[in-house]
Swiss-Prot record:
Its main location: cytoplasm. It comes from Roseiflexus castenholzii (strain DSM 13941 / HLO8). Keywords: Cytoplasm, Magnesium, Metal-binding, Nucleotidyltransferase, RNA-binding, Transferase. It is an enzyme of class 2 (transferase). Its EC number is 2.7.7.8. The lineage of its organism: Bacteria, Bacillati, Chloroflexota, Chloroflexia, Chloroflexales. Pfam families: KH_1, PNPase, RNase_PH, RNase_PH_C, S1. Residues 704-746 are annotated as: Disordered. This is Polyribonucleotide nucleotidyltransferase.
Amino acid sequence: MSERRIHSVSMDLAGRTLTLETGRFAEQANGAVVVRYGDTMLLATAVASKEPRTDTDFFPLTVDYEEKMYAAGKIPGSFFKREGKPTEGAILTARLTDRPLRPLFPEGYRNEVQIIVTTFSIDMVNDPAPLSIIAASAALAISDIPFLGPVGAVQVGYIDGALQINPPMPNMANSDLDLVVAGTKEAVLMVEAGANELPEEVMLEAVIQGHQVCKQICDLQNELVKLAGRPKKEFVPPPVDTSLEEAIQQWLGNRLYEAITDANKMVRDAQTEALKREVIAHFTADEPEEELEARTAAVSAAFENILYEEVRRMILERGERVDGRGPKDIRPISVEVGLIPRVHGSGLFTRGQTQVLTLATLGSPAEEQRLDDLGIETAKRYIHHYNFPPFSTGEIRRLGSPRRRDIGHGALAERSLLAVLPPKEEFPYTMRLVSETLSSNGSSSMASVCGSSLALMDAGVPIRAPVAGIAMGLITGKDGRWRVLTDIQGIEDHLGDMDFKVAGTAKGITGLQMDIKTTGITYEIMREAFAQAREGRLHVLEKMNAVISEPRKELSPYAPRIITLQINPEKIGALIGPGGKTIRSITEATGAQIDIEEDGRVYISTADAAAAQQAVAMVEALTREIKVGDIFLGKVVRIMPFGAFVNLAPGKDGMVHVSELDVGRVENVEDVIKMGDEINVMVIGIEPGTGKVSLSRRALLTGETAEDRRAAGAGRGLRDGGRSSGSERSGDRSPRSDDRPRPRRR
């Protein structure tokens, strides 16, 4: 075995040391790099197949992000004690890693490439997501796999009005921005962000500042390449038969332009496909059988290249899009709400031939989604799921679990609404939204943002402002010309150079995602894209506000009602009872769902108003602070020769001494009361330390006070005591708090 040669390089990044190391692990991979930042440590490996795949017309890149519980010092909780399928967070990190790397492989490269990023250690301070991009890029950079990197990546926060690079994870709870930017030394490749209604100027400055640091990280990777990089394998792109393309172009004449310039996607696709079949039939007519398959593939590829160039030429030279729109024009918009009975809220958003129906369901706090990603235990009270069935594009496909794309689109729409959600203190409901894509011709994720905003307002959720989303595109020319397109459709997304999605309110941006298919874009292009996106977003909001501009005043009659109580946290144990016995008895008696927070907030959820009031009364009785002078209607639960025990509240009894049962002398307790009787009693004493309660029936009969009875010698040995807590009821919605949800990128 040859001696290992370990190489490492380091730099200071936001006050912490970033280290890249290779040579210690995974020597059989084409490239392997360990990234360490603080005590967060990831291993990235890159492996390429020896031969290209011949059965595909796209680049077969796979990126996997493996979360290992040992990285957080934990054992998996499953029966087999092994990690299971990737969590949603792991899938989103894998997509985040994939997106800036994919454009940097040579055009026509068809060797299968697999990148695996494995978490070795997580310190809960340094976010592993941007480090995953750095690690994967470094592994590719030092490998022999053709790659046009390296790529740097950082996280940018906006805390107390200032941009910060790679803030510690605990600090992100107070940040109005959670942005990851990735890029080469020359240009920005990818942006992903959630924000609290920030203006375009702040977002652009965050991208620019982040990219400046990305350049330094690229320099660090280049240092490692000099120390340990392997020579790149030679890759010769497949030759392009320009003479074939010229012949097809001449034969087509103006027919391709006529076929693709139709506003209806289905008509346009049918005409284009029919024309393609004609071209293939004409240019393969005299081909020998043994060469027919290869010739057909060549003609098909040539036709696609001609289509690609024609669509781009129309936009760059004439500002004309295939559906007749100009660069800034938005497709016709239709908005409807309240279409679906029984659901708690619904919104149908249609833009051109993209249509999304979003449905809202409200639930109790107990229905929050509990997450445990590498030991970071959190709960989500706002959940958005995105579905993309095959009929939405007129296709047939097997149904199954959500694909990575579905999870990514759902997460983008989810974080775009976080900034406008009411705080839990004001609106304690769990909110689940499901966006059903019914028809798709570009930007269904942004239609999901619009549909979510509509459904929330239709459900009566008091969001701070409506949110709309729009997708921008980009066409660039070899001569340096470029045009930004507003509201791109499917063909422009497929043949264009950028997918730039922006969501927000009239005030500012709440969600952002940018993917590039070229080797990067300039700040000037981004500035124009932001400006054009704002115009488009305001146009969409105007259309939405014409139908519903604010949340409904009342919740759906089918939604549960939640009443909030505030109790002394010291009373939580009494409310729960031994083994949950007490709270379970209240739930069984009323049918209400009861949830308790550590700070003493109690949520009572039920659709039955009478049951809700019954549960409130039981909770208040149980958690009420008993004080001297209080009057109770209690039930006699035990009779003794010296008096009777009366139940005042679940789990709390007091004693009426025989001398306090009646005005006159009582020889036999049962001459006055019997087991099961309900009697009115006054608290005349509470024994310090034990909390034993002394009661008097006599005081209520004579009109005396607790002090009068104590002065007469009743409750001897007892002193006024007890703890004061009370049970403060706030109703369905407590006053608005400034503690609103912070943006999440994932």
